[in-house]
Amino acid sequence: MARTKSKPRKRTTVRKARRSVKRRTTTKGTKRKTAGDPVTKAKRGVATSSPFAAHHAVRMNPFSGATTQPKIPDGGFTSSLSRRLQNVVEVTNASNEGIMHLVMAPTMGVPICVTHTTEGASTRSGATLKPSYLGFLGQGVGLETKVGGVIKWPIANTDTGDVINAADFAKWRVVSQGLQITLNNVDDENDGWFEAVRFNWRNDNEDICLTSLDGTDTGNVIGAAPNLNGLPLLTANIVEMPGYKSGLLKDIKDYQFMLHPQQTRHDPVEITKSIDFVGGTDLNYDTQSKKANLGDSAAGTLLKQGLVDQNMDWMYIRIHPRSNTGAAGQTGSKLICNYIQNLEFAFSPDSDLATYMTTNRMDPKSAKINDQLNNNQDAANKKREFN
């Protein structure tokens, strides 16, 4: 009898028991992450910004709101106090006048002069240039002239007295300074164009004058302003000058003008409490332009040295406005000037403000910021480049 072949035994699969995983829970319960959830990176310490970043932001953009107490953190002062001076003024080209000349300078109190304006034609009708002076009234910076111990302005060319530093600071310097202009005309009357260049000042006494901060001819608080009489740039061909910019007046709102440092080291300007003057020699008062021109004398030079930050360059803007004949639709170009000057001071020990000064700490990047600014020769840059 034949043997039968045995069948192989069928193996049964044994499944291992699944190990339970304990999920983490929070007080709000368990939440499973989905594909749309953000990925959380492990913390390796909280990054902090440099304590000097806000100061450098204002140096690169004068209108920056990073801080209202901007400094140049280079250790140039042991301690200092900063001020942010700003004003907005509208100027219009005078009737039957041509080109408007605007100069912005690093001067104390009145940083801008613009010629051939309606205000200049009204207040200074006898002056050839019919200038307007744009200053910072009521912002804690200014000078006074005293004759016989009494404040007097305007002065006479026969007076003898003192120019008093009313703010009582011993040293100062410009942290940054800028200007924004907007054409305030309707679309049908927005023609006109502008040219702009930056230039190195020739360091001449006659380029500086003293005038009222409020732009009038009688305000007792005065400041140093650029004096455009005799400035060669007004009649020069500026197209070939470094940094030349031009454009339409309707587009000038897109630009920002600012002064640049001329070197990597920015020394403070020293100013004395009081400087004696002799009328007609140290200060020559011009009854037509309502200003006192600095004389070519020792006192005139001392005033110039204490009232101008010579570490900064100057700005010249030549404006070709719409004609102003006084007729309907021919009333010229209305320009809104928003100008700012960020200053750093060191006050005299006997000043009440001396106790508010804080340490000027040094950041090695300060010189690099200066170099970065003065490497840019452009007289104007688009506002978006400052953001």
Swiss-Prot record:
<comment type="function">
    <text>Self-assembles to form the virion icosahedral capsid.</text>
</comment>
<feature type="compositionally biased region" description="Low complexity">
    <location>
        <begin position="370"/>
        <end position="379"/>
    </location>
</feature>
<protein>
    <recommendedName>
        <fullName>Capsid protein</fullName>
    </recommendedName>
</protein>
<dbReference type="GO" id="GO:0042025">
    <property type="term" value="C:host cell nucleus"/>
</dbReference>
<feature type="compositionally biased region" description="Basic residues">
    <location>
        <begin position="1"/>
        <end position="33"/>
    </location>
</feature>
<dbReference type="GO" id="GO:0044423">
    <property type="term" value="C:virion component"/>
</dbReference>
<feature type="short sequence motif" description="Nuclear localization signal 1">
    <location>
        <begin position="8"/>
        <end position="15"/>
    </location>
</feature>
<keyword id="KW-1048">Host nucleus</keyword>
<feature type="short sequence motif" description="Nuclear localization signal 2">
    <location>
        <begin position="30"/>
        <end position="37"/>
    </location>
</feature>
<feature type="region of interest" description="Disordered">
    <location>
        <begin position="365"/>
        <end position="387"/>
    </location>
</feature>
<keyword id="KW-0946">Virion</keyword>
<feature type="region of interest" description="Disordered">
    <location>
        <begin position="1"/>
        <end position="47"/>
    </location>
</feature>
